[in-house]
Amino acid sequence: MKKAVVLLSGGMDSAAVIALAQEQGFAVYALSVRYGQRHTSELDAAARVAAAQGVIAHKVVDVDLRSIGGSALTDDIEVPDAGGDGIPVTYVPARNTIMLSLALGWAEVIGANDLFCGVNAVDYSGYPDCRPEFVRAFEVLANLATKAGVEGAGLRVHAPLQFLSKADIVREGVRLGVDFGVTVSCYRADADGRACGHCDACRLRAAGFADAGIPDPTHYAILS
């Protein structure tokens, strides 16, 4: 069976991506990153998703992005209740570049030619490393910078959610049997994974379920 490395944050998008990769016949190797995020509930969720969806292996890599800083997700910066103009303070500098690079390294080691990530450019917070241009550019980099790209069969970077609305992602996940109840999307989730209900991630998630007409299994502290 062909192998793929899938970035797994513990959120609803990455859970849906695992299911889509499996539907395409890939044996999924899930990679999560402990990058110094302020809460660990998303990594707990990643472990639940990996177990529930039967991945071949789930690796957690430590990278201390708190030492670089610059984000409300790693620093003592207040997470806003809603997105504003421009790139928000919840953007983590170079996060997707770093995570995809780690996935790329693991892919070479295990002989996988495919990387999957859950970036989205429709219902998203405006992060520059979620755009289609970024995904295409990283695939070019992957094939220039690796032995597998230069001497092997080449590497492909898949972003199957990039042009889907949040509602479409919910529908696809439900179709594939994803248990969204074990996922965590909130920027301010507590230790038990309860979502705050009013950050940008919570708003997008709640709207996705509402627009899809599917009950939202998320445990919210308060939903505004």
Swiss-Prot record:
Keywords associated with the record: ATP-binding, Ligase, Metal-binding, Nucleotide-binding, Queuosine biosynthesis, Zinc
Cofactor requirements of the protein: Zn(2+)
Pathway it works in: Purine metabolism; 7-cyano-7-deazaguanine biosynthesis
Gene Ontology BP terms: queuosine biosynthetic process
Catalytic reactions on record: 7-carboxy-7-deazaguanine + NH4(+) + ATP = 7-cyano-7-deazaguanine + ADP + phosphate + H2O + H(+)
Enzyme class: ligase
Residues that coordinate or bind Zn(2+): 186, 196, 199, 202
UniProt binding sites for ATP: 8-18
Alphabetical list of CDD domains matching this protein: QueC-like (cd01995)
Gene Ontology molecular functions: ATP binding; ligase activity, forming carbon-nitrogen bonds; zinc ion binding
EC number(s) per entry: 6.3.4.20
Cofactor binding mode and count: Binds 1 zinc ion per subunit.
Function, as annotated: Catalyzes the ATP-dependent conversion of 7-carboxy-7-deazaguanine (CDG) to 7-cyano-7-deazaguanine (preQ(0)).
Family, similarity comment: Belongs to the QueC family.
Database matches in PANTHER family: 7-CYANO-7-DEAZAGUANINE SYNTHASE
HAMAP family for the chain: QueC (MF_01633)
Name of the protein in question: 7-cyano-7-deazaguanine synthase
